[in-house]
Amino acid sequence: MGKPRRMMNRLRMGALPPRYSFVLNPHVRERFTKCPSCAASTRIRKLPLVVHVEHPGGPRLVLLNKTCRLCLMCETLIVDRVELENVIIAAGLSATVKPPDYVVLGTIDRRTWRRGLGDHASLLDIREHMADFKKYLKVDVVPAHGERSSRSAG
């Protein structure tokens, strides 16, 4: 007898079907030229992202066109945390040099992103043209050469 499948009833913000697995890369020196999920080569793509940012004046929904790494085989999207935080700070969404709390919610179609640049996109419009992420992944980097021994030479 098989186990019954559980249906995950997860609330979604976007109306479009979920797309991409998402990785926020916390490692400064790792650029993931190979996918952490399937080891296929990743491609550089510029994609419009929807980011929820905590702001002193109230929470904001920000549309950012960000250069990311994308695995076409398993549809994993990799965004560098440091680069994303620098864009958030440069956009004036942080009152200090420290980046605010944020969550990358999903992707949005390019046409809606362009309308959002001129403040012509409403929240309803963003939700209609947004795709949430299928899942959020966490990546741990293991050094290729292992740790060097600390033995002293003779």
Residue ranges: model-predicted function:
Residues 78-86:
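Iron-sulfur (Fe-S) cluster-binding segments and ferredoxin-like electron-carrier domains
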Residues 29-32, 68-71:
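Residues immediately within or flanking Cys/His clusters that coordinate Zn2+
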Residues 10-24, 48-60:
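Short Cys/His-rich Zn2+-coordinating modules
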Residues 31-64:
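Short recognition patches in nucleic-acid-associated and regulatory proteins
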Residues 24-26, 35, 89:
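A composition-biased, non-transmembrane "mature-region" signal
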Residues 37-40, 72-76:
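Short Cys/His-rich local motifs and their 1-3 flanking residues in nucleic-acid-associated proteins
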Residues 49-59, 86-97:
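Short cysteine/histidine-rich metal-coordination sites, predominantly Zn2+-binding motifs
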Residues 87-154:
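Long, contiguous alpha-helical scaffold regions
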